[in-house]
Amino acid sequence: MNDPRKTESTTHFGYQSVPESQKARKVAEVFHSVAAKYDLMNDVLSGGLHRLWKRFTIELSGVRRGNRVLDIAGGTGDLTLQFSRLVGESGEVLLADINDSMLKVGRDRLLDRGVAGNVRFVQADAEKLPFPDNHFDVITIAFGLRNVTRKEDALRSMLRVLKPGGRLLVLEFSKPSNALLGKVYDAYSFAFMPLAGKLITNDADSYRYLAESIRMHPDQETLKSMMAGAGFERVTYHNMTGGIVALHRGLKP
């Protein structure tokens, strides 16, 4: 009988090659570590630009009153907060995250902001979403897809739970379109990000993983092809901040 440890598929965890069964646990450890300071670090590392990137995502989503929205890897709830206001009492927003530490921070933050009634919190794996077919008008995943082990499975799962005509928006770090910007961004990522992580969260390794995971994530055209391959139509993307971040959008037929 073959030893399954010798045949198990591997994937990347940053620049490391690890068995697929271990990646989810390693990613979970990262986000358990950074959850409490996640919002602060977003502001520090992006200079506040993440708020503009998310605002554009909300604008392009076309969410309106009465919609049902799924915010995957919703974390501390930035998108969910805005979506809850847009869908109103007749709509619903589900904040889903596989990491219970991030989910707790998001739940506490939104409750402190008075968000209730039209928001639910669900611990869920993007690769196996626990929702009915044809259920959501809009799905977003912001800065989460690169941490998913089997991205194609996750995209197919998202397609399944979207209503026909529904929209998926993937906001993610990507590849700078200018070579000089890319060099500056690399220097920033591998020097400043781990240092800031050490000073603010006492965890340089998690932010070193962040920098590495960005480099291992598919570039704009590859992700566009992956979304089309999963069954999405009219897939487009918008580069922001010189391609450091890209917003992909696709429709379910």
Swiss-Prot record:
Per its UniProt entry, what is the enzyme's top EC class, as one word? Answer: transferase
The catalysed reaction is: a 2-demethylmenaquinol + S-adenosyl-L-methionine = a menaquinol + S-adenosyl-L-homocysteine + H(+); a 2-methoxy-6-(all-trans-polyprenyl)benzene-1,4-diol + S-adenosyl-L-methionine = a 5-methoxy-2-methyl-3-(all-trans-polyprenyl)benzene-1,4-diol + S-adenosyl-L-homocysteine + H(+)
| Matching InterPro entries | SAM-dependent_MTases_sf, UbiE/COQ5_MeTrFase, UbiE/COQ5_MeTrFase_CS
Among the Pfam families in the record, one is: Ubie_methyltran
Gene3D superfamilies with a match to the protein in the record: Vaccinia Virus protein VP39 (3.40.50.150)
Annotated SUPFAM superfamilies: S-adenosyl-L-methionine-dependent methyltransferases
The pathway that the record names for this protein is:
Quinol/quinone metabolism; menaquinone biosynthesis; menaquinol from 1,4-dihydroxy-2-naphthoate: step 2/2; Cofactor biosynthesis; ubiquinone biosynthesis
* Record key words, sorted: Menaquinone biosynthesis, Methyltransferase, S-adenosyl-L-methionine, Transferase, Ubiquinone biosynthesis
Q: What is its EC number?
A: 2.1.1.163, 2.1.1.201
Transmembrane feature ranges: none
Where along this sequence does the record place binding of S-adenosyl-L-methionine? T76, D97, D125, A126
Q: Which GO terms describe its molecular function?
A: 2-methoxy-6-polyprenyl-1,4-benzoquinol methyltransferase activity; demethylmenaquinone methyltransferase activity
Q: Name one GO biological process term.
A: aerobic respiration
Family recorded in the similarity comment = Belongs to the class I-like SAM-binding methyltransferase superfamily. MenG/UbiE family.
- Record's function text: Methyltransferase required for the conversion of demethylmenaquinol (DMKH2) to menaquinol (MKH2) and the conversion of 2-polyprenyl-6-methoxy-1,4-benzoquinol (DDMQH2) to 2-polyprenyl-3-methyl-6-methoxy-1,4-benzoquinol (DMQH2).
- What protein name is recorded for this chain? Ubiquinone/menaquinone biosynthesis C-methyltransferase UbiE
What's the source species for this entry? Azotobacter vinelandii (strain DJ / ATCC BAA-1303)
